[in-house]
Amino acid sequence: MKKRYSLPIWFITALAIALIVLHIALPGLIRDYLNKQLADMGDYRGHISDIDLALWRGAYQINELTISKVNGKVPVPLLNAPVIDLSVSWRALWKNRSIVAVVEFQRPALTFVDGGNATNSQTGEGVDWRAQLRGLLPIHLNELRVTNGTLAFRNFTVQPPVDLKATNVNAQLQNLSNVTDSSTPRPAKLNATADVLGQAPLMLKAELDPLGNLDDFDLQLRITDIQLKQLNSFTRAYANFDFNKGDADFVMELAARKGQLNGYAKPILRQVDIFDWKQDVANKDKNLIAGLWEAVVGSGGFVLKNQRQDQLASRIEISGDLNAYDISRWQAFKAILRNAFVKAFNSQFDGNKR
């Protein structure tokens, strides 16, 4: 008869106690480690309030991640993420025998601020956020999700303050596990939806390499039914006019190949009314010069628009070399877009004078 072997009861008890102690202590150790990583990010500093472990599903949650600007007077954080959930993809584990993760940002709020100067503005530039994400989530990512997020642009230095928001932001960035495959220049796919200014639906699709240099990508953006009066705080601050009524659609398609960017943007405005004599000139809170300026802007739109449909449409050609600037690809991308829109506006303005 074979002798049966069994583990001593004291060993089982000690192992159980050790696992319980580890389960209790590990979240605090992880939190302290991540906070140390987030404490030194140049102009920005991050903090995590708590970590929750769910070992039974191979997951952990980061609670209340806040990233704020250290210098300057910026009253809101760059990022506030109440919950970040990271879990192992069991499908990939069983199908491909690879350990990859899915990360979900729940109700994140990302806020950019124009403070009038670089010190008091908040753009997120100057930090390699991809490296910070890898530090926060030290596992091979395959998919990144955003659920019920908010994207905002604020300016607290003007009256009325500018507060533009896209709410109900839901996005999926998939196929990140193949970004190291050099044979596929645009391996990841991005799909996103949102409500701009409370009600205008936004749709965004892109194919790109999020860990690359933005040399190769395809992008499609569409926003419909923008109520132009919702933009008045922005137009008042940056162009000194108001919309009395009107709605708009905006479409943009861009493609980059080896750093060469090409595409177009097409704003379509309908039933636009910018100048109203009773509201703008007779309004005691506005001076005569401001009212006359809005009249000029409004008449310019009237000349350009389709008389039968009361519609103003324009196609703005966008092109440029992302490698031609001694700055980051993202900064070059913004500069090319800015130059295209400024050029289009100047061309239309000059055309109206003829």
Task: Describe the function of each predicted region.
Residues 64-65, 188-197, 206:
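Short beta-strand segments that buttress and anchor functional surface loops
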Residues 44-72:
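N-terminal leader/targeting pre-sequences
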Residues 10-19, 339, 343, 347, ...:
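Hydrophobic alpha-helical membrane-embedded or membrane-associated segments
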Residues 105, 193-196, 223-226, 266-274, ...:
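Short, solvent-exposed aromatic-acidic interface loops
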Residues 38, 51-54, 81-96, 128-140, ...:
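Extended lipid/amphipathic-ligand handling interfaces
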Residues 1-43:
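N-terminal type II signal-anchor transmembrane helix
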Residues 64-173, 271-299, 313, 320-349:
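Secondary-structure transition motifs
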